[in-house]
Swiss-Prot record:
PANTHER family: MITOCHONDRIAL RIBOSOMAL PROTEIN L24 (PTHR12903)
Alphabetized GO MF terms: rRNA binding; structural constituent of ribosome
Keyword match RNA-binding: yes
Lineage of producing organism: Bacteria, Bacillati, Actinomycetota, Actinomycetes, Micromonosporales
Task performed by this protein: One of two assembly initiator proteins, it binds directly to the 5'-end of the 23S rRNA, where it nucleates assembly of the 50S subunit. One of the proteins that surrounds the polypeptide exit tunnel on the outside of the subunit.
Protein name: Large ribosomal subunit protein uL24
Assembly and interaction partners: Part of the 50S ribosomal subunit.
Family: Belongs to the universal ribosomal protein uL24 family.
UniProt keywords, alphabetically: Ribonucleoprotein, Ribosomal protein, RNA-binding, rRNA-binding
Gene Ontology cellular component list: ribonucleoprotein complex; ribosome
TM ranges: none
Organism from which the protein derives: Salinispora tropica (strain ATCC BAA-916 / DSM 44818 / JCM 13857 / NBRC 105044 / CNB-440)
Length: 108
């Protein structure tokens, strides 16, 4: 499955516990078909407490984002509406992403 969502896109979560949430894509993992969305799918991770060189202790319970499957998000177009993503070849022969609903370019 090709991942049409890229880093920097604004997406809407359409399924799961964070349904309806909007956020910016921090990272995309095409081999796993997952994306990391800012402020979505926050989990608590328990990390071992360790001492740094200066004597400060780091660790404990850390809250961070976890990847979400790409099928659970939709890209938002320039109007802020969810849309499917398509491709078109422009005049220069470059492949550009377009919003299927409006036909506008999705320049990110």
């Amino acid at each position: 499955m090709t991942v049409k969502v890229r880093k920097g896109d604004t997406v809407l979560v359409i399924a799961g516990k964070d349904k309806g949430a909007k956020g910016k894509v921090i990272a995309a993992y095409p081999r796993q078909d997952k994306v990391l969305v800012e402020g979505v799918n926050r989990v608590k991770k328990h990390t071992r407490i360790s001492t740094t060189q200066r004597g400060a202790k780091t660790g404990g319970i850390v809250t961070q984002e976890a990847p979400i499957h790409v099928s659970n998000v939709m890209v938002l177009d320039s109007d802020g509406k969810p849309t499917r993503v398509g491709y078109r070849i422009d005049d220069n022969g470059q492949k550009v992403r377009i919003a299927r609903s409006t036909g506008k370019d999705l320049s990110s």
